[in-house]
């Protein structure tokens, strides 16, 4: 009788390692010690270890060391597949185990082996375990491997060198000749890796990078990977040096005609990111992307439509020729491509097809992930500004996204979009509030409920039928948690303030809240009831309607620090709170910038995919910024020389005085007191062969009459890689005016050579100095931010008799948004009435700023600006009001040289 075939359960897994136990596998390592070696058995055990590591299982140092040294016994095996697995295991464990350095002799022996596989893998492991003391001993092996004819060995050496460049930059830089030779290798991958390494070696020398790129353009690389990288290098040179040399642009344009799709796409993408681009250049790039839209390859279609989506934000006219092709992509089976196609069409489309596009998006909204939904929401937001009459369709669509399942990030982006529509289109207010009232009945995110209640309280009383919203608000008091109940109480009180007919009902509802179990709810209700009974409309307006001028998280940290310090002789000053907030950038669209620059990269290594370690300067900054600017006051007050200076009034941002990858990295922070300025120099020694002692900064002022040298605090010893601070204090007389001047600076120190292998110092050393960038004292060093509830009212109150009006031009500032940022940065004052927000492509704008001097005199600034006829400069009319004419002159001196 025929045997019965059993059907395997679909849920049954036949994966061998699924239920693997770490302890059991560790016991299996004894197979490595067997003699003779059984390749098949050892290969299985190594595969199990590699699976555990990839799964995220952690090994202690002892466990990792035992496994590592057991695996080294496999160097005796001649089985190539087993050796390959052994190299992989050693590479993974090398960063965990102790004394991995012992295998260097075996690895260097393999680097001379006739089998290329051994040589390449040995190099990869050496890269992991080598430090600055070992690399000089095996340097020759790396140099030989870089110029090796076998592409596997050469590529392994080049990529390993990219990693070693972070550990021992001075040694790797000596290999530039070998790397230059490797660029001529016939292998596509070797050319690519050689160019990547050579660029990193030279990246802090702009002239050297420019020469490198120029030479490679003439020699025409064969590798498409290297050509793509070279295009990015060209973009870097163009952006960093602002060069007008056509050779770089012409090379990128020539790559548009490349037969290789990757090279052609990279060229088109780069042209789309240029700040100054001609119609001919952009049309050629868009033409290439248009061809890719019709490609059979999903990756090409996705890359092209994503680039066009980004371009549509800055140059929608250039994208219009692709509309028909993108409409064909709306039905693409890849939902990511379809979403980007529709959002791009929304940015460049016309009013007649908006409804159709929105309906098409709604049909497959559930099939795309939240990241792409955020892209859709952003497109809808920009669409509301372009076609305000379509607000009903936009609000309904956004509300659908809000109600569907999704992350808080998506919900927040959607709510922000609805708020933008309400702010820009007053007619949309009632339909938006109605939809949001329904949403908070079943909202899973307290943060969103609080924001919506705030909006209803602000806008609900001003609608045609305010009473309809009260039921939704009071339901939150009855049904939700303490945070939401407190927000609901405030929202109810706003109705009583802004809509007089409901005042009595509001008082009744607030009285019911007096028995709430939550302190915050009871306290708010008590305060509002007291103000209503006293009919204190002015204070009610201030409490209920004025926005907090700083981010609440920053305010909380500053208040906690104020309480912790325990010095209550002076009241808390809200102007000391930082206004910096984090913003979200969708990773789908990217930033359109080159992935590398002459400074330290923030996004990591573009070739190897590993994160870059922060440079010494950045580490130095982060150590102090982690606790906020207020930490400076605590630290400086503990230094005896500065303890008599009084209260710290202001600290500047970090000012770089050297390049980030030089021998000595120095930046400065200016600390302003009532009669003193303390310069804090953060110094880092990046040379492991040197130890510095008696480190100080010599400052020579451009106008010595304005100030007097007070004291200097040097660094006793500055070893390799340990950031430390030295200080210089000067004194000035406020009655004589603030000391606006510049300083030439030099870092002075004694150098003692260090043997990196033993740590021994070469006494007695020698004196040396290192030139630093000039440092300036500018007006914003003596100006603090100030916040007012209503700028317009305060502006009117100030007399025009003492106002100062000055016109000037910001040369080379080609956009209003850039001009606004430059003025705010130059004065260091606080924007008022959200005037820092600029409408896209606006040709004129008015910016309002408020600040105060160090003696607490208020300053109000109004900056009217517009682009000139050439569209290359911005004309500014600056009006300054304060009670002191000399203060007005002082503020304007930030822009006008007297």
Swiss-Prot record:
Keywords: Cytoplasm, Cytoplasmic vesicle, ER-Golgi transport, Golgi apparatus, Membrane, Protein transport, Repeat, Transport. The keyword Transport applies. One of its GO terms (molecular function) is structural molecule activity. It is found in: Cytoplasm; Golgi apparatus membrane; Cytoplasmic vesicle, COPI-coated vesicle membrane. It is a peripheral membrane protein. It comes from the Eukaryota. HEAT repeats lie at residues 62-99, 170-207, 280-317, 319-352, 353-389, 392-427. The keyword Protein transport applies. One of its GO terms (biological process) is endoplasmic reticulum to Golgi vesicle-mediated transport. GO terms for cellular component: COPI vesicle coat; endoplasmic reticulum; endoplasmic reticulum-Golgi intermediate compartment; Golgi membrane. Residues 592-631 are annotated as: Disordered. Residues 613-626 have a biased composition (Low complexity). Pfam families: Adaptin_N (PF01602), Coatomer_g_Cpla (PF16381), COP-gamma_platf (PF08752). InterPro entries: ARM-like, ARM-type_fold, Clathrin/coatomer_adapt-like_N, Clathrin_app_Ig-like_sf, Coatomer/calthrin_app_sub_C, Coatomer_g_Cpla, Coatomer_gsu, Coatomer_gsu_app_Ig-like_dom. The coatomer is a cytosolic protein complex that binds to dilysine motifs and reversibly associates with Golgi non-clathrin-coated vesicles, which further mediate biosynthetic protein transport from the ER, via the Golgi up to the trans Golgi network. Coatomer complex is required for budding from Golgi membranes, and is essential for the retrograde Golgi-to-ER transport of dilysine-tagged proteins. Oligomeric complex that consists of at least the alpha, beta, beta', gamma, delta, epsilon and zeta subunits. Belongs to the COPG family. This is Coatomer subunit gamma. The gene is copG.
């Amino acid at each position: 009788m025929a045997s019965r075939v059993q059907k395997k359960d679909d849920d049954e897994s036949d994966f061998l390692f699924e239920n693997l136990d770490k302890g059991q596998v560790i016991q299996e390592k004894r197979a490595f010690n067997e003699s003779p070696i059984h390749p098949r058995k050892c290969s299985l055990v190594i595969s199990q270890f590699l699976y555990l590591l990839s799964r995220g299982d952690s090994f202690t140092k002892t466990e990792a060391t035992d496994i590592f040294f057991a695996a080294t016994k496999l160097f005796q095996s001649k089985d190539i597949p087993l050796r390959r697995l052994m190299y992989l295991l050693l590479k993974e464990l090398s960063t965990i185990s102790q004394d991995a350095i012992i295998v260097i002799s075996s690895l260097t022996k393999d680097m001379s082996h006739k089998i290329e596989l051994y040589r390449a893998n040995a190099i990869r492991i050496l890269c992991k375990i080598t430090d600055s003391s070992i690399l000089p001993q095996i340097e020759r092996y790396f140099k030989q491997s870089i110029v090796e004819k076998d592409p596997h060995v050469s590529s392994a050496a080049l990529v390993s060198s990219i990693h070693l460049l972070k550990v021992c930059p001075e040694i790797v830089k000596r290999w530039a000749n070998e790397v230059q030779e490797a660029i001529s290798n016939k292998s596509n991958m070797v050319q690519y890796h050689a160019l990547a390494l050579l660029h990193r070696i030279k990246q802090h020398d702009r002239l050297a990078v420019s020469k490198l790129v120029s030479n490679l353009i003439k020699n025409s690389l064969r590798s498409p990977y290297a050509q793509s990288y070279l295009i990015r290098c060209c973009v870097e040179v163009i952006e960093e040096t602002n060069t007008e040399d056509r050779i770089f642009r012409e090379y990128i344009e020539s790559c548009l005609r490349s037969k290789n799709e990757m090279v052609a796409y990279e060229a088109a993408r780069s042209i789309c990111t240029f700040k100054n681009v001609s119609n001919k250049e952009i049309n050629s790039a868009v033409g290439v992307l248009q061809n890719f839209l019709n490609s059979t390859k999903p990756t090409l279609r996705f890359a092209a439509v994503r680039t066009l989506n980004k371009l549509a934000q800055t140059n929608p006219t250039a994208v219009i020729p692709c509309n028909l092709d993108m409409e064909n992509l709306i039905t693409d089976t890849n939902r990511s491509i379809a979403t980007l196609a529709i959002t791009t069409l929304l940015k460049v489309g016309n009013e007649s097809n908006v409804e159709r596009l929105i309906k098409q998006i709604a049909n497959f909204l559930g099939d795309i992930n939240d990241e792409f939904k955020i892209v859709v929401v952003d497109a809808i937001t920009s669409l509301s500004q372009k076609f305000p009459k379509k607000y009903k369709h936009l609000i309904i669509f956004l509300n659908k996204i809000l109600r569907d399942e999704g992350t808080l990030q998506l919900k927040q982006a959607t709510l922000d979009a609805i708020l933008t529509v309400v702010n820009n289109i007053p007619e949309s207010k009632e339909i938006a509030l109605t939809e949001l009232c329904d949403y908070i009945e079943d909202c899973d995110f307290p943060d969103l409920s609080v924001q919506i209640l705030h909006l209803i309280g602000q806008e609900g009383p001003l609608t045609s039928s305010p009473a309809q919203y009260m039921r939704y608000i009071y339901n939150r008091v009855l049904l939700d948690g303490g945070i939401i109940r407190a927000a609901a109480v405030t929202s109810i009180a706003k109705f009583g303030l802004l809509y007089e007919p409901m005042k009595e009902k509001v008082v009744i509802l607030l009285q019911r809240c007096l028995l709430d179990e939550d302190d915050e709810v009871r306290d708010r209700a008590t305060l509002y009831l007291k103000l209503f009974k006293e009919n204190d409309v002015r204070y009610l307006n201030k409490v209920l309607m004025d926005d907090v001028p700083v981010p609440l998280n920053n305010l909380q940290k500053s208040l906690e620090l104020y309480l912790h310090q325990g010095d209550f002789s002076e009241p808390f000053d809200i102007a000391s709170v930082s206004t910096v907030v984090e913003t979200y950038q969708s990773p789908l669209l990217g930033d359109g910038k080159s992935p590398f620059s002459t400074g330290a990269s923030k996004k990591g290594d573009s070739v190897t995919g590993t994160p870059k370690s922060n440079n010494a300067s950045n580490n130095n900054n982060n150590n102090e910024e982690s606790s906020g600017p207020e930490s400076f006051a605590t630290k400086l007050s503990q230094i005896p020389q500065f303890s008599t200076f009084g209260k710290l009034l202001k600290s500047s941002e970090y000012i770089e005085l050297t390049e980030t990858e030089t021998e000595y990295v120095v930046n400065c922070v200016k600390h302003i007191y009532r009669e003193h300025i303390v310069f804090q120099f953060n110094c880092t020694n990046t040379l492991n062969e040197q130890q510095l002692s008696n480190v100080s900064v010599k400052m020579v002022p451009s106008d010595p009459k304005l100030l007097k040298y007070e004291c200097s605090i040097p660094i006793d010893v500055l070893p390799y890689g340990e950031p430390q601070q030295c200080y210089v204090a000067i004194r000035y007389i406020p009655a004589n005016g603030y000391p606006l001047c510049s300083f030439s600076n030099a870092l002075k120190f004694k150098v003692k050579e260090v043997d990196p292998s033993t740590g021994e110092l070469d006494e007695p050393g020698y004196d040396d100095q290192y030139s630093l960038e000039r440092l300036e004292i500018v007006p914003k060093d003596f100006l603090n931010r100030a916040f007012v509830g209503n700028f317009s009212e305060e502006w009117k109150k100030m007399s025009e008799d003492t106002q100062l009006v000055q016109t000037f031009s910001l040369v080379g500032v080609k956009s209003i948004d850039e001009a606004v940022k430059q003025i705010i940065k130059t004065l260091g004052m606080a924007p008022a009435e959200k005037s820092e927000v600029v409408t896209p492509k606006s040709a004129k704008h008015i910016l309002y700023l408020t600040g105060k001097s160090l003696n607490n005199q208020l300053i109000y600034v109004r900056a009217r600006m517009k682009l000139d006829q050439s569209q290359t400069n911005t004309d500014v009319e600056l009006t300054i009001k304060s009670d002191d004419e000399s203060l007005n002159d002082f503020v304007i001196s930030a822009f006008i040289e007297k």
